[in-house]
Amino acid sequence: MDLKVVAVSFLLLVLCSEAAGYQLLTWEQANTAVKGVLDKVHSTGVEKLRDIYDKSVDAVGTYTSILTDQLYHWWCGEQ
């Protein structure tokens, strides 16, 4: 619930800060401003998730290779 309040407050801040004088922005201008902010936020979130995914895949790949090597030497022994 707190996240919704923060998001609505942020959107209102963006809309009000883009007002010129006493005139409010038209719907199209407001829509464009909000979409720009949301794209920036979305891109940052996606990049963070992609970075976490890449790091975890690298770690799992390393340990899988080590485990595979150990199982191979345990099963086949030294020949």
Curated annotation (Swiss-Prot):
Q: Which N-terminal residues, if any, form the signal peptide?
A: 1-21
Q: List every stretch annotated Lipoprotein lipase cofactor.
A: 56-79
Keyword set includes Secreted: yes
Spell out the post-translational modification annotation for this entry: Proapolipoprotein C-II is synthesized as a sialic acid containing glycoprotein which is subsequently desialylated prior to its proteolytic processing.
Q: Which GO terms describe its cellular component?
A: chylomicron; high-density lipoprotein particle; low-density lipoprotein particle; very-low-density lipoprotein particle
Q: Indicate where this protein resides in the cell.
A: Secreted
Alphabetized, the UniProt keywords read: Chylomicron, Glycoprotein, HDL, LDL, Lipid degradation, Lipid metabolism, Lipid transport, Secreted, Sialic acid, Signal, Transport, VLDL
Region Lipid binding: list its residue ranges: 45-52
Q: Which Gene3D superfamilies match?
A: Apolipoprotein C-II
Q: Which InterPro entries match?
A: Apo-CII (IPR008019), ApoC-II_dom_sf (IPR023121)
- The primary location reported for this protein is secreted
| Pfam families found in the cross-reference section | Apo-CII (PF05355)
What GO molecular function terms would the record report? phospholipase activator activity; phospholipase binding
The question of whether Membrane is a record keyword is answered with: no
* A Gene Ontology BP annotation from the UniProt entry: lipid transport
Q: Which domain of life is it from?
A: Eukaryota
Q: Which family is this sequence assigned to? A: Belongs to the apolipoprotein C2 family.
PANTHER family the UniProt entry points to = APOLIPOPROTEIN C-II
**Role, per record:** Component of chylomicrons, very low-density lipoproteins (VLDL), low-density lipoproteins (LDL), and high-density lipoproteins (HDL) in plasma. Plays an important role in lipoprotein metabolism as an activator of lipoprotein lipase. Both proapolipoprotein C-II and apolipoprotein C-II can activate lipoprotein lipase.
UniProt protein name: Apolipoprotein C-II
Please name the gene that encodes this protein. APOC2
